[in-house]
Amino acid sequence: MDQSLSQQIKKEAQNLGFDLVGIAPAGEAPHWDRLREWVERGFHAGMEYIPRRLSTYRHPSGVLPGCRSLVMVAASYLPVPLANIPPGLGRIAAYATRTDYHTVLREKLRLLAGFIEALIPGTQTRPAVDTAPLMERSFGWLAGLGWIGKNTMLIHPQFGSYFLLGVVLTTAELPPDPPFSKNYCGRCQACLEVCPTGALVAPFTLDARRCISYWTIEAKTVPPARLRPFFDQWFFGCDLCQQVCPWNRRILRSGGVPGTESLLVVEARQLPPHVAMSEVLRASDSILRQWFRDTPLWRAKPAGLRRNAAIVLGNCLRKEMPSYENGCSNAAGRSDISPSNISSGSATPIGQLTSRSKRSPGDFPENAAQPLSPQAADWQDVLASALQDPDPCVRRAAAWALAGRPTLTVGSILHEVFARETDPEVRQEISALLSEISTASGSSAEGP
């Protein structure tokens, strides 16, 4: 194997703007057995494309027949400090605040693939950016780009976990780099402890059924009611397990890695890190497309974005309750939020959870008498309008959000909507909310 070929390929990757580059041999994917076990335990949630292509993940030849090497690259992106934001705004995960990374990285990877084919005549290549059935993080570790942390992210000593991976698979046999030699997580448990829904069920293990990022990006339905309060103001994705990682501390403090200029920063337009949720709910599909079409947010599509916005506003309304305790709690290790009771509905009622919204039935009459702030009144108006959205998931989320500040008016609106609603899941959601409002207010009125 010609070492000079590898050096030329790495140099070209750096010239194209990639921050890290390494070469991994094409063998059975490291940690494939763990992926299979992860799927068997149902941790993939609704991402059925993973078990459907599980055998393909086992070896890169399933992506490129005859593959012998993987050129792994990484492009860093800028973090967004987790500062307090005004109510009514939604947080966006840092990676999604710029032009879709698929667009930027794919073009650079095509150029790198063309360079490899010109350098080594007769070789075949295939570039990929997290859309092929390939265990990129495992091969990133194998190529020496970092270690896999307890938050399941690939972590590099200089860049932390604020980078995205790409790969060029090739039939050329290139000298491989050594795997990253050590895991520097040590005894740190910060990521497990900060996760509000307990999605990191163990070190290096993520249960997507509890993950805020899964529910706001990948899911096509509405998250379980018991999880929604823990989303707080996360509108798209979640960065909490990265924000607390000690290896990201310097990057967060300096706003990036000093002395580097990532292609994801130079060649991408900037989105604001926070978005007004009422505007998302008011916007037409065409307007949402205009705002988000070339960003990662478009993966959620208009219905998903409106669903997420409604949940954020519901949490903001709950924050206006006098009984609301504005603290940072988490569900890690809790016995009342588990895969079985999330799906079966047997978890402890929200009012009894150790969550941000500690309310009891006796609180509601007093709370209902409290005047709404002007912005909360606006949220209620836009949520009431969202009850007529054509997508049932949006209607479910809007009903739950509207009930975040239960009043006689809200009860009346929900009764009217229930009377005309035909979708069984939306009817079930509204029925449960009306029963909760009725019980909490001490009313003798019967539910629907």
Language-model regions, residue ranges each:
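Leucine-rich solenoid repeat scaffolds
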Residues: G411-A419, D423, R427-S435
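Intrinsically disordered, low-complexity terminal tails and inter-domain linkers enriched
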Residues: S254-T260, R318-A377, S438-G447
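Iron-sulfur cluster-binding cysteine motifs and their immediate structural context
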Residues: A190-S213, K220, F231-S262
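Short inter-helical turns and helix N-cap capping residues of alpha-solenoid HEAT/ARM repeat scaffolds
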Residues: P302, P390-D391, T422-D423
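Auxiliary alpha/beta "docking" domains used to position bulky ligands
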Residues: M1-Y184, P223, D232
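Amphipathic alpha-helical scaffolding segments comprising HEAT/armadillo-like alpha-solenoid repeats
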Residues: L288-W291, S373-L387, T407-F418, G442-P448
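Structural detector for internal amphipathic alpha-helices that build alpha-solenoid repeat scaffolds
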Residues: R307-K319, E366-S373, S385, R395-T407, ...
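C-type cytochrome heme-c attachment and multiheme electron-transfer modules
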Residues: G255-L317
